[in-house]
Swiss-Prot record:
PROSITE patterns: COMPLEX1_ND1_1 (PS00667), COMPLEX1_ND1_2 (PS00668). The chain crosses the membrane at residues 11-31, 81-101, 114-134, 154-174, 186-206, 237-257, 265-285, 304-324. Keywords: Cell inner membrane, Cell membrane, Membrane, NAD, Quinone, Translocase, Transmembrane, Transmembrane helix, Ubiquinone. Belongs to the complex I subunit 1 family. Its EC number is 7.1.1.-. This is NADH-quinone oxidoreductase subunit H. It is an enzyme of class 7 (translocase). NDH-1 is composed of 13 different subunits. Subunits NuoA, H, J, K, L, M, N constitute the membrane sector of the complex.
Length: 325
């Protein structure tokens, strides 16, 4: 097999790694929906889904079958093309955002020198999906939910990006692998604690998760921008939301908690355990916090998160300049 050159083998292995990592992310996002319902049942002193399979283990399969056979309905006066594209853009952008996350020293889909900027770009692209969904549905509740979601996401992406600049300044690179290697001695969560707090809050808001789920507030907007979606289109939005949680959790681990670094266990196991911990924290937050008003969410972002990120960035810059002297 003379055509099987070393360069071609490297390319095929890279493609295989990318496919495996992205499939694992999609699977984790899907299974998180089942895990969330089980954990919410535990937190609220009830059973949760336990009828399909042993202990409810096949509930996810039942949900997938139900969603697959539901009518793929499109509203009569909607923009059919944009209405169909919106869930695809949402799912794809959130999945591609995970591509820059290194799960071990040798396993990463795209080891980009502008990794953090690529993530912020994909997070911004997801806003278009929400706007497209709300506008193309020709529904006032969808449009209001899309306007809420876009304003909230764009606002908190500012704090999300600023909270990462301290980490970038310390590592001297936008590359995620370089940032992880820079945490071999001390995790960034210690010198960048306020940056981590702001990133965690902004990450929950960007994912539209409770308590920042005003764009989907059932009591006010009847499920917001995807009220008109059903079948697999709704499934793409649904799984995409959980993929966003997986991505934000993985970024917390990579940027602030040493990535794959840890004693005794293999690097991938450490990364998976840390990521699973933060995924559970998302669920715990949903189970324990009330939903504030929309104006309170926006006010909190601009009056609390923004000053905190700016102070953190200024202090980090001052410390780096002092150490350089």
């Amino acid at each position: 097999m003379s055509w099987l050159t070393p360069d071609l083998i490297d390319i095929l292995l890279s493609i295989l790694k990318a496919v495996v990592i992205l499939l694992v992310v999609v699977t984790c996002g899907a299974f998180m929906s089942f895990g969330e319902r089980r954990l919410l049942g535990l937190f609220q002193n009830r059973y949760g889904p336990n009828r399909v399979g042993w202990g409810g283990s096949l509930q996810l399969v039942a949900d997938m079958i139900k969603m697959f056979f539901k009518e793929d309905w499109i509203p009569k006066f909607s923009d059919r093309v944009i209405f169909t594209l919106a869930p695809m853009i949402a799912f794809t952008s959130l999945l591609l955002a995970f591509a820059i996350v290194p799960v071990s020293p040798t396993w990463v889909v795209a080891d980009l020198n502008i990794g953090i900027l690529f993530f912020l770009m994909m997070a911004g692209l997801a806003v278009y999906a929400v706007l497209f969904a709300g506008w193309s549905s020709n529904n006032k509740y969808s449009l209001l939910g899309a306007m809420r979601a876009s304003a909230q996401t764009l606002s908190y992406e500012v704090f999300l990006g600023l909270s990462l600049m301290g980490v970038v300044a310390q590592a001297g690179s936008f590359n995620m692998t370089d940032i992880v290697n820079n945490q071999a001695d001390i995790w960034n969560v210690i010198p960048q604690f306020f940056g981590f707090v702001t990133f965690a809050i902004a990450g929950v808001a960007v994912c539209h998760r409770h308590p920042f789920d005003q764009p989907e507030a059932e009591q006010e907007l009847a499920d917001g921008y995807h009220i008109e979606y059903s079948g697999m289109k709704f499934g793409l939005f649904f799984v995409g939301e959980y993929i966003g949680i997986v991505t934000i959790s993985a970024l917390m681990v990579t940027l602030f908690f040493g990535g794959w670094h840890g004693p005794f266990l293999p690097p991938f196991i450490w990364f998976a355990l840390k990521t699973a911990f933060f995924m559970m924290m998302f669920i715990l937050i949903r189970a324990s916090l009330p939903r504030p008003r929309y104006d309170q969410v926006m006010s909190f972002g601009w009056k609390v998160c923004l000053p905190l990120t700016l102070v953190n960035l200024l202090v980090t810059a001052a410390v780096i300049l002092w150490q350089a002297q």
